[in-house]
């Protein structure tokens, strides 16, 4: 094992506190330098991966799951008998489920039937009720069903991850500040897949004013290039490419959109695991593939790219990510 770096050696072991609940453990995820993958792909930039699967329920969505429920509590919108109902592609549902379990709320989640069985089992494990909608309808179908459930369920509320301002706000307050502090502000590109748009909006709104030369790069499925003006089509990159432009997405912070196809996302996620030992999901592969593309450009030599690794690979065991393994 390598000796600790000078910076890590000065830290005292432990966190210096005991968390009052699992919700308090969200955030402060590590940023890790990719040491071999960029070289293997001919990239001459420094590529850093922010590993969001270090959150308690193993994804970036833990941040918004906690933030949305806490915001509704503070606003007096929910009580002990409230039923939370949300359309979700999976990881937001798991985030809401662990927070709801911790705080004692009933939760119903609506999702496309194409979502992995691991996500569904985890949701049930955490006590959530699951309603599946046709895969061909994408997230639009799940949203319509969830809205109907809210209309017909007394004392129910929808957090509305695609519209809820607590979503980008938590990334402004936490994710952006973590990236800035951990890199010392030395960041030239920020790369993130777009699902709800909360991560790229929150981070972009905070970091671009501080570093005007910073380029914010959105990643979307090549098969469903809605951000680029194309049509929604089925794809295998779960968690991004919802098929519409989310209300909370601030497109003004985006400098570039990179389209990654499902096969490349899967191939890159596998390479990330085998070459770097970083077990990310399919959307992680998409973000890293985009970062590698950018890193190979002549103008990117010597630059620093931070890419979001949103979730853990184990959540995709039944998907194409693990086919043939």
Locate predicted features.
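PLP-dependent amino-acid enzyme catalytic core
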Residues: 1-325
């Amino acid at each position: 094992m390598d000796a600790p770096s000078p910076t890590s050696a000065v830290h005292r072991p432990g966190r210096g506190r005991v968390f009052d609940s699992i919700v308090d453990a969200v955030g402060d995820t590590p940023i890790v330098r990719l040491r071999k993958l960029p070289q293997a792909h001919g990239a001459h930039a420094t590529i850093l991966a922010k590993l969001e699967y270090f959150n308690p329920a193993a994804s970036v969505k833990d941040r918004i799951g906690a933030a949305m429920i806490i915001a509704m509590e503070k606003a007096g919108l929910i009580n002990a008998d409230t039923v939370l109902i949300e359309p979700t592609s999976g990881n937001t549902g798991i985030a809401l489920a662990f927070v709801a379990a911790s705080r004692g709320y009933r939760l119903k989640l609506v999702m496309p039937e194409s979502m992995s069985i691991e996500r569904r089992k985890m949701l049930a494990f955490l006590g959530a009720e699951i309603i599946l909608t046709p895969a061909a309808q994408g997230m639009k179908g799940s949203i319509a069903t969830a809205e109907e459930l809210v209309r017909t369920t007394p004392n129910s509320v929808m957090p509305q991850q695609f519209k809820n301002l607590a979503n980008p706000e938590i990334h402004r307050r936490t994710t952006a500040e973590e990236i800035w502090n951990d890199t010392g502000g030395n960041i030239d590109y920020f790369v993130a897949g777009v699902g709800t748009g909360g991560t790229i909006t929150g981070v972009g709104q905070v970091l671009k004013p501080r570093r005007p030369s910073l380029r914010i790069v959105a990643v979307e499925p090549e098969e469903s290039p809605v951000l680029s003006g194309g049509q929604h089509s089925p794809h295998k990159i779960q968690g991004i490419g919802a098929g519409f432009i989310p209300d909370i997405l601030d497109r003004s912070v985006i400098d570039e959109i990179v389209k990654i196809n499902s096969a490349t996302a899967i191939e890159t996620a596998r390479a990330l695991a085998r070459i770097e030992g970083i077990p990310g999901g399919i959307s992680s592969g998409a973000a890293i593939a985009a970062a590698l593309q950018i890193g190979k450009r002549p103008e990117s030599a010597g630059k620093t790219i931070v890419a979001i690794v949103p979730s853990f690979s184990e959540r995709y065991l039944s998907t194409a990510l693990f086919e043939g393994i």
